[in-house]
UniProtKB/Swiss-Prot annotation:
Signal peptide: 1-30
Gene3D superfamilies with a match to the protein in the record: 3.10.20.120
Main localisation: membrane
Described function: Binds various plasma and ECM-proteins.
Alphabetical list of Pfam families matching this protein: MAP
Keywords of the record: Cell membrane, Membrane, Repeat, Signal
MAP repeats: 45-154, 156-265, 266-374, 375-474, 475-584
One GO cellular component term: plasma membrane
Cellular compartment(s): Cell membrane
Protein known as: 65 kDa membrane protein
Superkingdom of origin organism: Bacteria
Length: 584
């Protein structure tokens, strides 16, 4: 005890001595300069540091317009930094953890402002205990070589195909594909079961939950030596034996999803729920419905929660992704509760019965909206003629935007500024827009293409957008088509012509309306007269020598579209009944 007391006293004296020295230094520095409030915990997180990064995959580098964002003067570990690096590799280049594990090389280099650098292996999984101050990082370069070793490529080429069949409720289905293994690969029954479950879900839509609730679920492995082994898909028990893939002849999968008689009675379970959005709760008159399948897993329950959030409050997956809070609480009748994050992809294998749930409370706190709108200048060139545009493209809300969103805005201004609609764009010779970035790069997008790019870009990185459309139309806005009218065999010369717009392709329905209009104005023949006429038709003569006869009394038209410039002339022929016949 005396020895312990002596050590404690010695340590205390040492601390007091060092503290006294520090007091003097701190007093001197405090007198020299004011307190830096940015380092205070009260102000922590309000200022950000943006660290530029580059990604090189298989020797090819890509310009990254965005940056890694950290809190200013934040001390982070190499583990946290690695998670951020893996995140941008996944989002920007689609490289997952598995790809990194199987890659030839995966590393990133941290460049510090003092001129030093540190190289970290992404495959090692070993981290130093050192912390880095985010304000000291100058840049980060990520380098991944996904090329496999030569021996791995040889292995991949030697695949072994195993045929399989699926029988559900006594009905068998021909499967054209096979289960694929590496030749002479030793696999466990657990791995084999995972493959069987995968094809059950992809081919027949049978999930793990369906298997658990099924009456029977098994598969039979038939070996080339004539033996076979039956495995229960519901047991979850696996032997330690390994199978050589080349010894398997075929696999038969058999599932009986029919419920027992006691489960056949249909019952609809209703679970009340409430939604709290940004601190404001609303009364929900409807309930979550669990019909026929009262047992559910948390993944399906989360999908139902997201559905009612979208339906009741208009909150989409995107809104949830950027929300400050997004979770729901399941209250059970036994007094227990469970909180689940809506943005989490990790679900427990537990099943929940609807009758055990008392209520569900959904809580969402959305992020603040963007304080300022963003504007991008644009130009429109139609058939080589460009006009100055005084307004800009306006982007509101999320600072990131996809090419699909830009295409919608481009179509909108084409319609508003130049009267060019979807139909004109569809038949245009050329319809593109070029996005010019501030870093000097550019990207040309076809307006008529179905853009499937998932890349998002920051509006602030766009310098301007040039829209270019070539419609192939001539300067004349309208075509004038000569026509004749013959009533009861008597034709009269018509000095005027049918005026038809060149701005778009026309249909026979459109032409019908034009013909009926001139019949009424020139000969006083109304729609009612045409209805009771013995014959009412017109013939369209095209410049290529073809012709088309159209019945004016019919409301059925061919879906063909054509240009007014292709019409040579139109002959209209109407034969009316005599008055005596008409009165009968």
């Amino acid at each position: 005890m005396k020895f312990k007391s002596l050590i404690t006293t010695t340590l205390a004296l040492g601390v007091l001595a060092s503290t006294g020295a520090n007091f003097n230094n701190n007093e001197a520095s405090a007198a020299a300069k004011p307190l830096d409030k940015s380092s205070s915990s009260l102000h922590h997180g309000y200022s950000k540091v943006h660290v530029p990064y580059a990604i090189t995959v298989n020797g090819t580098s890509q310009n990254i317009l965005s940056s890694l964002t950290f809190n200013k003067n934040q001390n982070i570990s190499y583990k946290d930094l690695e998670d951020r690096v893996k995140s941008v590799l996944k989002s920007d280049r689609g490289i997952s953890d598995i790809d990194l594990r199987l890659s030839k090389q995966a590393k990133y280099t941290v460049y510090f402002k003092n001129g030093t650098k540190k190289v970290i292996d992404l495959k090692a999984g070993i981290y130093t205990a050192d912390l880095i101050n985010t304000s000291e990082i100058k840049a980060i370069n990520i380098n991944v070589d996904t090329k496999k070793q030569v021996e791995d490529k040889k292995k991949d080429k030697a695949n072994y195909q195993v045929p399989y069949t699926i029988t559900v409720n006594g009905t068998s289905q021909n499967i054209l594909s096979n289960l694929t293994f590496n030749k002479n690969q030793n696999i466990s029954y657990k791995d084999l079961e995972d493959k069987v479950k995968s094809v059950l879900e992809s081919n027949r839509g049978i999930t793990d939950v369906d298997l658990r609730l099924s009456k029977q679920a098994k598969y039979t492995v038939n070996f080339k030596n004539g033996t076979k082994k039956v495995i229960d898909l519901k047991s979850g028990i696996y032997t330690a034996n390994l199978i050589n893939s080349s010894d398997i002849k075929s696999i038969n999968i058999n599932v009986d999803t029919k419920k027992h008689i006691e489960n056949k009675a249909k019952r609809n379970y209703q679970v009340p729920y409430s939604i709290n959005l940004n601190g404001t709760s609303t009364n929900i008159l409807s309930n979550l419905s669990f019909s026929n399948k009262p047992w559910t897993n948390y993944k399906n329950l989360t999908s139902q929660i997201k559905s009612v959030l979208k339906h009741d409050r208009g909150i989409s997956e995107q809104d949830l992704k950027y929300a400050k809070k997004a979770y729901y609480t399941v209250y059970f009748k036994n007094g227990g509760k469970r909180i689940l994050q809506l943005n989490s992809k990790n679900y427990t294998a537990n099943l929940v019965h609807a009758k055990d749930v008392k209520r569900i409370e959904i809580t969402v706190k959305t992020g603040t909206k963007a304080k300022a709108d963003r504007y991008v200048p644009y130009t429109i060139a139609v058939n080589g003629t460009s006009t100055p545009i005084l307004s800009d493209l306006k982007f509101t809300g999320d600072p990131r935007v996809g090419y699909k969103d830009i295409s919608k805005k481009v179509k909108s201004v084409l319609k508003h500024d130049r009267g060019i609609g979807e139909r004109e764009l569809k038949y245009a010779k050329k319809a593109t827009y070029t996005v010019h970035f501030k870093n000097g790069t550019k990207k040309v997008i076809n307006i008529n293409s179905n853009i499937s790019q998932l890349n998002l870009l920051y509006v602030q990185d766009i310098k301007k957008i040039d829209i270019d459309v070539k419609t192939g139309t001539k300067a004349k806005a309208d075509s004038y088509v000569p026509y004749t009218i013959a009533v009861n065999g008597t034709s009269t010369p018509i000095l005027s012509k049918l005026k038809i717009s060149n701005k778009q392709l026309i249909s026979y329905k459109y032409l019908n309306d034009k013909v009926k209009s001139v019949l009424k104005s020139e000969r006083g023949i109304s729609d009612l007269d045409l209805k009771f006429a013995k014959q009412a038709k017109y013939t369209v003569y095209f410049k290529n020598g073809k012709k088309q006869v159209v019945n004016l009394k019919s409301d059925i038209f061919t879906p063909n579209l054509f240009s007014a410039k292709d019409i040579k002339k139109i002959d209209i022929d109407v034969k009316q009944y005599t008055k005596s016949k008409k009165n009968k």
